[in-house]
Amino acid sequence: MYEGVVQDLIDELGRLPGVGPKSAQRIAFHILQAEPVDVRRLAQALMEVKAKVRFCATCGNVAQEEQCNICRDTRRDPSVICVVEEPKDVVAIERTREFRGRYHVLGGAISPIDGVGPDDLRIRELLARLADGSVTELILATDPNLEGEATATYLARMIKPMGLKVTRLASGLPVGGDLEYADEVTLGRAFEGRRLLDV
């Protein structure tokens, strides 16, 4: 344990996802040893991202304007929507350069253990996007873990009666893994081999 502000910094860094106590301590001491100008740049970047970045009004992806770049891109196919859990999944899929449709970010996955139900996700917004009938295919690209599968099944059962083609990314993604950690080739193959969900 350190005193005062040093321990406060370590504690705050430790609250970040994927940063354990040892990593938090290493980062804190890196910051302490950094030049003041570098620390100011980091602090400024943190403040700016909180002030300028929001979530796209259409799809829920990160954006600096009302709509994200993908929703504003007229070259994207608006008839195909890929449903993902988080904005980081959009980045992972975009790296493959395989998908030319639009996205819908749910903001998580159904997880009763964590107290996250369907009403906590952006499902109502998805249904509103599907209401005009212009979407012909919905690709469910939730994580291949228990929560992601539960979310995909829930959505498929809800949307299937609308007559849309509902597909799920193919295997190749490790069960229990997260999309953001998949390499481009694996994720690209999973996209190519997506399958129809029969519920």
Curated annotation (Swiss-Prot):
Per UniProt, the keywords (alphabetical) are:
DNA damage, DNA recombination, DNA repair, Metal-binding, Zinc, Zinc-finger
Q: Which residues form the Toprim domain?
A: 79-174
The superkingdom listed in its UniProt entry is Bacteria
| PROSITE patterns, A to Z | RECR (PS01300), TOPRIM (PS50880)
- Say if the entry is tagged with keyword NADP: no
GO BP annotations, alphabetical order:
double-strand break repair; recombinational repair
Q: C4-type zinc fingers: which residues?
A: 56-71
Q: Which Pfam families match?
A: RecR_C, RecR_HhH, RecR_ZnF, Toprim_4
Supply one GO molecular-function term. Answer: zinc ion binding
This chain's function reads:
May play a role in DNA repair. It seems to be involved in an RecBC-independent recombinational process of DNA repair. It may act with RecF and RecO.
**Which family does the similarity line name?**
Belongs to the RecR family.
Listed name of the protein: Recombination protein RecR
Organism of derivation: Streptomyces coelicolor (strain ATCC BAA-471 / A3(2) / M145)
